[in-house]
């Protein structure tokens, strides 16, 4: 009787790492800290599969999604002329139009639309009429960043289609849920919000940002619970209105990113499948 051939053993299927989403939160000038976190991830060989940003985080997310490495992001940030992204308007629905910011983003992303960028990108803004969040994954990246960053009373609301939008930080200070919605299996959240600290606020812009911090605190606590890793750069002394402390913010992001690396690697190993 002929022997029945035994099929060769099937080699084990290699494990696949989880799909990683990077959620970059709002915090105005403190947003430069996101760059330091990105640099640490790159140096560790950890590459997010998608990035989503709110407010200041949307600007960094857009440039990162366009293929800018961390070192280049830092160079761009340190060279940024604040006046180049500020176009004052007559008092009305906002002191700043925001078109200069949109133009700057278009230039920095090579004029590509959101869906044409190398890395999947999501940008969160707030629908002014409904108060609901809107996740932009298609269209004009400059316009989406402008909408996401449109602090009410400072920036004019941004019309996209038939709707008007303002700062995404009002409804999603750190957009963890939207990273999940985009397909992330592991979410790294970077929280740069300035917690209300009881100190007296100075100018009107600082007072407005402090108000947002108070409003966003409970939303943040709820949303961050769904993140796998939360990175919180220590930004004491760096106010949301302080655009002169860019290098200090980037360095703070690096320190916080390095501190989170061990936990991140362990979480990635747990989610291999």
Q: How should each PLM-predicted stretch be described?
A:
Residues 1-52, 63-273:
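Patatin-like phospholipase
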Residues 53, 57:
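Gly/Ala-rich beta-loop-alpha elbow adjacent to hydrolase catalytic centers
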């Amino acid at each position: 009787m002929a022997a029945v051939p035994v099929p060769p053993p099937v080699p084990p299927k290699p494990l696949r790492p989880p799909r990683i989403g990077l959620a970059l939160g709002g915090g105005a000038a403190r947003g430069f800290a996101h760059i330091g976190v990105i640099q640490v991830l790159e140096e560790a060989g950890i590459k997010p599969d998608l990035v989503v940003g709110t407010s200041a985080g949307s600007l960094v997310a857009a440039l990162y999604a366009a293929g800018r490495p961390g070192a280049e992001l830092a160079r761009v940030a340190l060279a940024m002329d604040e006046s180049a992204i500020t176009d004052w308007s007559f008092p009305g629905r906002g002191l700043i139009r925001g078109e200069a910011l949109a133009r700057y983003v278009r230039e920095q992303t090579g004029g590509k639309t959101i869906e044409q960028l190398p890395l999947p990108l999501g940008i969160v803004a707030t629908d002014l009429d409904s108060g609901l969040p809107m996740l932009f994954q298609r269209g004009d990246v400059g316009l989406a960043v402008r909408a996401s960053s449109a602090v009410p009373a400072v920036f004019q609301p941004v019309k996209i289609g038939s709707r008007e939008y303002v700062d995404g930080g009002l409804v999603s200070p750190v957009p963890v849920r939207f990273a999940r919605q985009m397909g992330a299996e592991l979410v790294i959240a970077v929280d740069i919000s300035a917690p209300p600290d009881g100190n007296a606020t100075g100018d009107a812009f600082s007072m407005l940002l402090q108000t947002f911090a108070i409003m966003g605190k409970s939303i943040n606590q709820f949303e961050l619970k769904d993140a796998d890793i939360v990175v919180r750069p220590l930004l004491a002394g760096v106010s949301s209105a302080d655009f002169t402390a860019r290098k200090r913010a980037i360095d703070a992001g690096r320190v916080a990113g390095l501190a989170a690396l061990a936990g991140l690697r362990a979480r990635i190993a747990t989610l291999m499948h």
